[in-house]
Amino acid sequence: YEKGFLQNIEYSIKYDMLHNFNNKLDVISLDGRISTGFKGNSEISITHDYDFVSYYLDKKYSNYASTRIGLNTSPIELLSFGSDISFGKDVAFNDENPELGKEFNFRATLSLQLNNNFSISNLFSFSRLKKVEINEFYYRGFINRLNTKYQFSKSLGIRLATEYNDFSESIFLQPLFEWTPNPFTIFYIGGNQILNKDDKYFVDRSQMFVKFQYLISL
């Protein structure tokens, strides 16, 4: 396939029977995966995970599955994109009385290398787990994170990370200055600012940090 649009096809099947530290059965599952590579440094994959049985907090869950479809591509050096969707059933681990729910997850990443010095990347992820019998959710929300980086030189650069978390209704900001004159010396100075929503207002929590590391070889 090397000269055509279709580059390669790979598949795998995995069977697991896992036990916990007390040597009790924890999970029996069967996973199947197929991936296809295309011209332009692109890949599409499909993964199916079937759990015959699993245990959580001494509770048994039987015969449930989930499917994940993924796409990754980097057709040119300055652009890369990745995305995956998963759906099926999963355990509501965060609930006081964990039951199986209907899950749906979506994730997308986009990275741009605008020039040798400046790059931008964005990550968006959405997750929800819906109760099977009624129209209610164990959880539902999204997180969006934007990272920017500018390199003045190989050793000197600045970064800025911004994130909005819909689950906690919070905003996270992190500016960072970094200096690495050689592989043995690292210097960071930056800060974290978290804005948490409290009723109608955002509560500000700020933190500054400095890190210096020098490796001495003996």
Question: What kind of feature is each model-predicted range?
Answer:
Residues Y1-L218:
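Exposed, low-structure sequence patches enriched in small/polar residues
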